[in-house]
Design a protein with these regions (language model features):
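Conserved acetyl-CoA-binding loop-helix of GNAT-fold acetyltransferases
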Residues: 125-138, 161-165
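Conserved beta-strand in the GNAT
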Residues: 60, 66-75, 113, 118
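A short beta-loop-alpha structural element at the N-terminal edge
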Residues: 2-16, 24-28
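A short helix-loop-beta-strand connector motif used in the catalytic cores of GNAT acetyltransferases and
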Residues: 47-60, 77-81, 113
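Conserved GNAT-fold acetyl-CoA-binding loop/helix
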Residues: 23-46, 57, 91-94
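C-terminal "cap" of GNAT-fold acetyltransferases
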Residues: 110-111, 145-160, 165-167, 172-193
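Conserved acyl-donor/pantetheine-binding loop and adjacent beta-alpha core of acyl/acetyltransferases
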Residues: 77-112
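Conserved acyl-CoA
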Residues: 105-110, 120, 131-147
């Protein structure tokens, strides 16, 4: 297993890993445009470094020479701009640039926000997600953030237990695309713990 920063050339391999997470969120965009169109648009947008899932905002786990999982996030103060590159991709594909994947605010102030943690379906149960989670403190600290935040669906108690076990605490709630989420945070001590 090897974790490294995502690269622009990873875009086509990352998109199908992230897509099931977006599908589970029941985003209106997917219902409107379908999985294949969304995958194509997502792959194009990942090549933009400033995008929510832009390669410069992500790390990937390589297993057996392939991307087994990915984690994407950003400092909370970047949230207002993270979807602008997707609007450009929509225009390039002659689609309405106001029809973004996400419309809700997700981050809490002054945190490095883990937007998405995704593991390829065939790689689940191999510790990929936990390895990516353990790598995040270094990512957050490199961006001068001493707190990591994330949202976990209230309907997913297993994930909530995992994050709790890894030191995250529930600090609030969010409603995203009609689903209720626990907002959890982990405070770092400067050494990544």
């Amino acid at each position: 297993m090897h974790i490294r920063p995502a690269r622009a050339e990873d875009a086509a391999a990352i998109a199908p890993v992230i897509l099931p997470v977006l599908e589970a969120m029941e985003l209106p965009f997917l219902a409107r445009h379908g999985l294949e169109t969304t995958r194509t648009l997502l792959a194009s947008a990942i090549a933009h470094p400033a995008y929510r899932y832009g390669y410069a905002r992500g790390i990937v786990q390589i297993l057996d020479g392939r991307i087994a999982g990915a984690a994407f996030g950003y400092p909370a103060e970047d949230e207002a701009q993270v979807d602008a590159p997707f609007a450009v991709v929509l225009q390039q594909h002659r689609l309405d640039p106001t029809q973004l994947l996400f419309t809700d605010l997700e981050a809490f102030p002054d945190e490095w926000y883990l937007d998405t943690l995704a593991v390829a379906p065939e790689q689940r149960g191999r510790g990929v997600g936990q390895a990516l989670l353990r790598a995040l403190p270094e990512v957050a600290l490199a961006r001068d953030k001493t707190r990591i935040g994330l949202n976990v669906d209230e309907a997913n108690p297993g994930a909530h237990r995992l994050y709790t076990r890894l030191g995250y605490k529930t600090v609030g709630t969010r409603e995203l695309s009609g689903h209720r989420y626990h907002h959890m945070q982990k405070t770092l001590n400067g050494r990544g713990h």
